[in-house]
Amino acid sequence: MKKILIITDAWEPQVNGVVTTMTTVVQKLREKNFAVDVIHPGMFHTFPLPNYPEISVAWNFWDLKKKIEKSNADFMHISVEGPLGVTGRHYCLEHEIPYTTCIHTKFPEYVYERFGIGLDVTKGLLKWFHNSAAKTLVNTESHKAELEDDGFTDLVLWSRGFDEKIFYPCPEGGKQKYLLYVGRVAVEKNIEEFLKMPSELPKVVVGGGPSLKSYARKYPDVDFVGFKKGKELADYYRDAACFVFPSLTDTFGIV
């Protein structure tokens, strides 16, 4: 049985597209009889990311070497460009171990929206991180083309799917006639464009995030219902008149 080691700075209990993607990948790989080890922040001492307490950052990541060697995996994948990812990259290069990485989102645009850091700075760091990988997985053809224009190399398309047993259309169309946003409630999602736009229909927001409390106070006419999963989430989609997704920093957008 082949063993795959995944190193990720994004893992449960975080709720976001990266975590949804990677937990699903691990589940499906194990169903196909792969052995999968995951190294994640929950295995280390962590501190909450400033201004984003939902995200835990590992700080004693020098213990990563022992965990990699203990896994003795046949393949290695580094999912996120965080402290664990950077340390895992260094280990692989030092020991001449080929590995793959993944670009989940338009991170330079995300960082610019949240912190005002120039796009070229972040793109340079990402190229340094990813261009040493054997292959880098990307979500869409359009994002792949953008990254190639920016100088990223060895890119491979890795799209997404959904569980059609849970997510299927309502034959009658939206029953409750509201506008729906699903995703992280944060400034980089450009969600305020949705919240402030005029509409004759009520608005529903599914999800949480650092801007939830402030937006809920600012837009009391919007129904913020928090995180939802599985059938409950699917029901919100089925009952909506229209799904609105204003983000300018997403690639595929797992919501």
Annotated model-derived regions:
Residues 213-232:
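Nucleotide-activated donor-binding/catalytic signature segment of Leloir-type glycosyltransferases, i.e.
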Residues 124-169:
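Donor nucleotide-sugar binding/catalytic pocket of nucleotide-sugar-dependent glycosyltransferases
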Residues 162-177, 214-216:
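Acidic anion/phosphate-binding donor-loop and adjacent secondary structure
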Residues 235-240:
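Short alpha-helical donor nucleotide-sugar binding micro-motif in glycosyltransferases
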Residues 98, 109-128:
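Nucleotide-sugar donor phosphate/pyrophosphate-binding loop at the beta->alpha transition
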Residues 248:
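Aromatic "clamp/platform" in nucleotide-sugar-dependent glycosyltransferases that forms part
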Residues 171-206:
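Conserved donor-binding/catalytic core segment of Leloir-type glycosyltransferases
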